[in-house]
Design a protein with these regions (language model features):
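Nuclease catalytic cores that cleave nucleic-acid phosphodiester bonds
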Residues: 87-257
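Domain-level signal for Mg2+-assisted phosphodiester chemistry and nucleotide/NA-binding surfaces
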Residues: 1-111, 155, 160-168
């Protein structure tokens, strides 16, 4: 079975870090091995490919901690140690169109990431038959991707199993399902399903909880073609926490070698 995980990097980062850092000071749960996230929590046969959509923070903001670009590049380097992972980059644009003079230029907008994610999923689903995914994981809580899910479920040439992964427990799977069903009914009015007479499989929606994330961390000691490097201190979780949460000792991120 060909499986593909599509990750909205911005949505994952803010979903995990804002929820867990505010709740328990556990922003380090965002130091994620995305391949392990699927293989350990949703195991199945076949090779898994991961496509990660992000943007370099080229636009500096006055209220952000200095060194954001360097932190991004370190994370980008860590990402590349994950097997079968492709990074697709968009860009940031300063938000200078706001009418409020006090906030103008103090925010930035990520451009092309959402569109690139949707286009990539469509290109894969409608591509050569031997390359089409049979199971798609979408790691994003962005409701703007619901029409894409609809296209995968109702319009793709071959049925595709879809699993939506919501980045944090701040979101409810039932709420997403309800919103998707409303979107689906609306879209069916103008875009009839190519499988209208076939009972399609429902969209599976799973919330990434603390145990899933803690069991899917990148190692803190990494190596690539440029040499060895480590997870920075601000991403590391306390040893006592890892003792409690890592249900398999081999999955601990603080083990060297």
């Amino acid at each position: 079975m060909r499986r593909v995980l599509y990750v909205d990097g911005f949505n994952f980062y803010y979903g995990v870090t804002r929820y867990w850092d505010k709740k328990k000071e556990l922003a380090g749960l965002g130091w994620c091995d995305f391949s392990a996230l699927v293989e350990r929590n949703f195991p199945d046969a076949g090779k898994l490919h991961t496509k990660y959509f992000t943007a370099f923070p080229s636009v500096e903001l006055p209220h952000h901690r200095p060194g954001e670009g360097g932190r991004y590049l370190l994370w980008r380097r860590a990402l590349q140690t994950i097997g079968n992972l492709l990074v697709v980059e968009g860009f940031y644009k300063r938000d200078d169109d706001r009418r409020d003079q006090d906030t103008r230029g103090k925010r930035r907008i990520e451009k092309q990431t959402d569109v690139s994610l949707a286009v990539e999923m469509m290109a894969d689903a409608f591509g050569p038959s031997d390359m089409r995914p049979e199971h798609v994981f979408i790691l994003s809580g962005d409701c703007d991707q619901m029409p894409t899910v609809f296209a995968l479920q109702e319009r793709a040439p071959a049925p595709i199993r879809v699993t939506v992964l919501l980045p944090s427990e701040a979101e409810r799977s039932e709420g997403w399902q309800d919103a998707y069903e409303r979107t689906r009914r609306r879209l069916l009015k103008g875009h009839p399903s190519v499988r209208r007479n076939v009972l399609g499989s429902p969209v599976e929606v799973r919330v990434l909880d603390e145990k899933m994330l803690a069991a899917s961390l990148l190692n803190y000691y990494l190596h690539d073609s440029e040499g060895s490097f480590e997870c920075p201190h601000y991403w590391r979780l306390p040893t006592a926490y890892l003792d409690r949460q890592c249900r398999n000792s081999k999955w601990r991120p603080d083990l060297q070698g």
